[in-house]
């Protein structure tokens, strides 16, 4: 019984550490993307850091918002934009390694989920609230 508790505690510590890294990296990406679209492409965007668990980027002209929410207890990251909804969860695989699941519009997406896919989802969500043409 102690071995099970020890394994669960170790897995929780791994998930907590990976989740904290993802929160930091994704938050940085949200800030960079909002700044890039505002300064380089003229999008009327405003970043709102509600707290460390919720960030939103708002189109100041239309009021449309993209939100990025972090649930540290469940190790879930939710990314929403106009017509965009992704959910990522930090899990421990059967082999005891940290991994991720990804759902798009509530449906589990098969295949390998990477940090790059999470950052792409952030870009898509923020880009979805602008009226800018897609870059060539």
How would you label these PLM feature ranges?
Residues 2-47:
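Contiguous, amphipathic alpha-helical segments that mediate oligomerization or scaffolding
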Residues 49-136:
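Intrinsic disorder/low-complexity polar-acidic segments
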